[in-house]
């Protein structure tokens, strides 16, 4: 049967199954009184496999899109009555329902039921009993499953490609946290912005864009807190200083983060920290050079002090199999990066306080402080002498000199009702893993800390509407509902006896589907939609990187090509994932990335050919990385030692170049909507039951791309980022969807790549945006550039290589 595109939303309900055969029991599907008698004997004498747990899954061909809870001791007629809200962007001929029996290791299939996709396309509701079949599609006795489905095609969605549209836009539906109004958002590029770096960027209402300084603001927020300081991090390092700009000194700014937190705790401020407990240090990855998280050092530093620092492992939910539990606890992380404090009200005379939160990609640890100059060598005797970070070379050290690894990141400050949602997230996590109940009871401080309330008037043109999203499950957050019905009401997804918040992925999908003109993404990783990859040397169904984001982006571009409209997707990623670039883990991730790009370009080139358009697919979807190259200056830091000869380190030092590490997790849509958080575009971050993540999504209701382009803070922020990356501004950058803009940006980035990769070094790079070094053939196949099999100064393949020993669950 031919496969058809399901692109939209599938509402599905699995009610019950009937007359199942139980392979675990000698009683099989015998009459109930016989089954009970035989199973009682089995349990008494210790034969058989004990209590039977039955669950059902939903697949679009080989892509898993839903899973019920387990029903215990009802192996013949289990009743689930569970409903699913499924975003789909899949080619499929059938919706497949599989009934399984759970085992301590893995599961046993009872059979599968099939509903042809063709029957769903008219959008009518189908309520039906389906035969459960064996692998030969033959019915398994009288076994049946009762399901209900209705498909809503994305093209019939009144919000498809319409943008935010209205100040009444309610936010992303079916989520744990609702959208909040009357908020204020501060956007940060990198940990610091030097004075006078950003040129004049005009905004609406005669205003100009004003940059903000993340670590200075966090320093002030912690310093001025009077009641609470709550911090979560993948890594928190006590020895860093937050204030380092000699042109912008602050009283007490030379204190380390650890000393500052101890000082505040000794003053009576409740300081609670949840730092990821790197239990195994993910041995395979660690060996390849990923940075140590300092978790043990941080815990030891605060031991015996007034600071309550808890190392929390990424514990599984209570429901997984032995293998699943082991995978979660050893392979996945707590990745949220938040700071929550009480803060003075804007009118200084008041004694009342409010909650302010910080959310984004920046951990409070070493290697993160940087500015838009992203110097490789010129700060090694000052800002970065005691904060030298270079995990891509096995033996790198300040003694051997640069290049250091520059760090590009994005963060945000949230004020108003949204800040309280970040606080609630911390409280849920602390109650689950924090141990002692040390959370401040804010209702007891209601005279001092005002409850959630707007910080901007509705008529203020700078107001924001903001929504909080997460990837997290009941193993990491306290108080999730126990039943699928209650979970659905709370905007959560129920799985095989686990409750999951997967709203970050939902937020990305929702924003992409609404997009009208362009999308700009910066992310540390870009891989996924593996169900649509070509099966070259792999079985796509074995990879498990099932999130929809790359496929949604490709389908958005395809829809615009078919409609004869312009649309451009810009994606900035690191040159390679942090670590030794030749290592198995880095090469495996690059291989997944290449397959993801190729899947997207294949869709786009097929759409262009179908319309008879001869065009470069990079005019519609284009990838970049960041890098720097510096000529040697007099008076530069002189290292005491030399790198080992003929190594990546020595070659990079000689060539005076290195990548700028893109650690950001951000998407801008039409200059009107922005997502910032900790979540990468990979399955680990988007799954919900793997790495724990947090993100905000927001817009300014008075600055929407309705009748004219949006010119609010999000536009100014994108233009500031483009100035940082390109080293210039141009009027054409105000129309990113236009052919003129994308071709100009691509030309500049190709020129910068040629300068970066050249054997000659005549001058500093004028900008940092480099065209990602791949070619795209007319059929969408991603190729090496001529003479560019390896990244400069390395023996690391640009297109990556499939790993024979690294499990996909770890690298995807």
Curated annotation (Swiss-Prot):
Binding, a 1,2-diacyl-sn-glycero-3-phosphate: 335, 524, 663
Catalysed reactions, semicolon-separated: a 1,2-diacyl-sn-glycero-3-phosphocholine + H2O = a 1,2-diacyl-sn-glycero-3-phosphate + choline + H(+)
Prosegment residue ranges: 1-46
Tissues/organs with expression: Expressed in leaves, roots, developing seeds and cultured cells.
Chain ranges of the C2 domain: 1-130
Disulfide bond sites: none
Summary of temperature dependence: Stable from 4 to 37 degrees Celsius. Activity is reduced to one third of the original level after incubation at 50 degrees Celsius for 30 minutes.
GO biological process: phosphatidylcholine metabolic process; phospholipid catabolic process
UniProt-annotated catalytic positions: 335, 337, 342, 663, 665, 670
MF terms (GO), sorted A to Z: calcium ion binding; phospholipase D activity
Binding-site list for Ca(2+): 190, 374, 408, 724
CC cofactor: Ca(2+)
Subunit details: Monomer.
Domain description: C2 domain is a calcium-binding fold, and the binding promotes the protein association with membranes. A lower affinity toward calcium can be anticipated for PLD alpha due to the absence of two potential calcium ligands.
Protein name, UniProt field: Phospholipase D alpha 1
Source organism of this protein record: Oryza sativa subsp. japonica
Top-level taxonomy: Eukaryota, Viridiplantae, Streptophyta, Embryophyta, Tracheophyta
């Amino acid at each position: 049967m031919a496969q058809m595109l399901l692109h939209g939303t599938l509402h599905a309900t699995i009610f019950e199954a009937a007359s199942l055969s139980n392979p675990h029991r000698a009683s099989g599907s015998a009459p109930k009184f016989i089954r009970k008698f035989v199973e009682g004997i089995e349990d008494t004498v210790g034969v058989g496999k004990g209590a039977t747990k039955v669950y059902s899954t939903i697949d679009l061909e080989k892509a898993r899109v839903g899973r019920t809870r387990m029903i215990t001791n009802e192996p013949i007629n289990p009743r689930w009555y569970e409903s699913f809200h499924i975003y789909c962007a899949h080619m499929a001929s059938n919706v497949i329902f599989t009934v399984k029996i759970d085992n301590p290791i893995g599961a046993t299939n009872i059979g599968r039921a099939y509903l042809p996709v063709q029957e769903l396309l008219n959008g009518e509701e189908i309520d039906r009993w389906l035969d459960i079949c064996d692998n030969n599609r033959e019915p398994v006795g009288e076994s049946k499953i009762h399901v209900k489905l209705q498909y809503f095609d994305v093209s019939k969605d009144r919000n498809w490609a319409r943008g935010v549209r209205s100040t009444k836009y309610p936010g992303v539906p079916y989520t744990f946290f609702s959208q909040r109004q009357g908020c204020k958002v501060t956007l940060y590029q990198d940990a610091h912005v030097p004075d006078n770096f950003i040129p004049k960027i005009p905004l609406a209402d005669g205003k100009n864009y004003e940059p903000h300084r993340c670590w200075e603001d966090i320093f002030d927020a912690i310093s001025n807190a009077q009641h609470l300081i709550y911090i979560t991090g993948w890594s928190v390092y006590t020895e860093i200083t937050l204030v380092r700009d000699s042109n912008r000194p602050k009283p007490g700014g030379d204190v380390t983060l650890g000393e500052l937190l101890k000082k505040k705790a000794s003053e009576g401020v409740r300081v609670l920290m949840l730092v990821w407990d790197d239990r195994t240090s993910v041995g395979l990855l660690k060996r390849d050079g990923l940075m140590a998280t300092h978790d043990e050092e941080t815990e030891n530093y605060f031991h015996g002090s007034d600071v309550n620092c808890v190392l929390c492992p990424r514990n599984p939910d209570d429901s997984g199999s032995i293998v699943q539990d082991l995978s979660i606890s050893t392979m996945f992380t707590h990745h949220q990066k938040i700071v929550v404090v009480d803060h003075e009200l804007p009118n200084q005379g008041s004694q009342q306080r409010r909650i302010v939160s910080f959310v984004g990609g920046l951990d409070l640890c070493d290697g993160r402080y940087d500015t838009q100059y992203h110097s490789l060598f010129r700060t090694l005797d000052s800002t970065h002498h005691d904060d030298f970070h270079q995990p891509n070379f096995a033996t790198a050290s300040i003694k051997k000199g640069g290049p250091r690894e520059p760090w590009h990141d994005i963060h945000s400050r949230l004020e108003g009702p949204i800040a309280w949602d970040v606080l609630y997230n911390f409280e849920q996590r602390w109650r689950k893993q924090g141990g002692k109940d040390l959370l401040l009871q804010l209702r007891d401080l209601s005279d001092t800390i005002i409850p959630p309330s707007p910080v901007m008037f509705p008529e203020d043109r700078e107001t924001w509407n903001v929504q909080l999203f997460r990837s997290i499950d009941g193993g990491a957050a306290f108080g999730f509902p126990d039943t699928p019905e209650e979970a659905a009401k709370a905007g959560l997804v129920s799985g095989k006896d686990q409750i999951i918040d997967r709203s970050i992925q939902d937020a990305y999908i929702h924003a992409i589907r609404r997009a009208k003109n362009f999308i700009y993404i910066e992310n540390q990783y870009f891989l996924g939609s593996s169900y649509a990859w070509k099966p070259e040397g792999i079985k796509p169904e074995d990879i498990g990187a099932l999130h929809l984001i790359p496929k949604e982006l490709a389908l958005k571009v395809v829809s615009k090509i078919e409609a004869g409209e312009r649309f451009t997707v810009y994606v900035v990623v690191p040159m390679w994932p942090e670590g030794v670039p030749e290592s198995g883990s880095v090469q495996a991730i690059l291989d997944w990335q290449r397959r993801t790009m190729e899947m997207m370009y294949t869709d786009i080139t097929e759409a262009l050919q179908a319309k008879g358009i001869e065009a470069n697919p990079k005019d519609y979807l284009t990838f970049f990385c960041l890098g720097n190259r510096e000529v040697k200056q007099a008076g530069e830091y002189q290292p005491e030692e030399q790198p080992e000869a003929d190594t990546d380190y020595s070659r990079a030092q000689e060539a005076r170049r290195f990548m700028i590490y893109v650690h950001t997790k951000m998407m801008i849509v039409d200059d009107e909507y922005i997502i910032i958080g900790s979540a990468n575009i990979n399955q680990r971050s988007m799954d919900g039951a793997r790495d724990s993540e947090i993100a905000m999504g927001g817009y300014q209701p008075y600055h929407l791309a309705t009748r004219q382009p949006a010119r609010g803070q999000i536009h100014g922020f994108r233009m500031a980022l483009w100035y940082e990356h390109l080293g210039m501004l141009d009027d054409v950058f105000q129309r990113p969807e236009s052919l003129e803009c994308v071709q100009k940006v691509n030309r500049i980035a190709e020129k910068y790549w040629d300068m970066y990769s050249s054997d000659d070094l005549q001058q500093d790079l004028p900008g940092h945006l480099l065209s990602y070094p791949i070619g795209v053939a007319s059929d969408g196949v991603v190729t090496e550039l001529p003479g560019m099999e390896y990244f400069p100064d390395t023996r690391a393949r640009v297109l990556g290589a499939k790993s024979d020993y690294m499990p996909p669950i770890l690298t995807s």
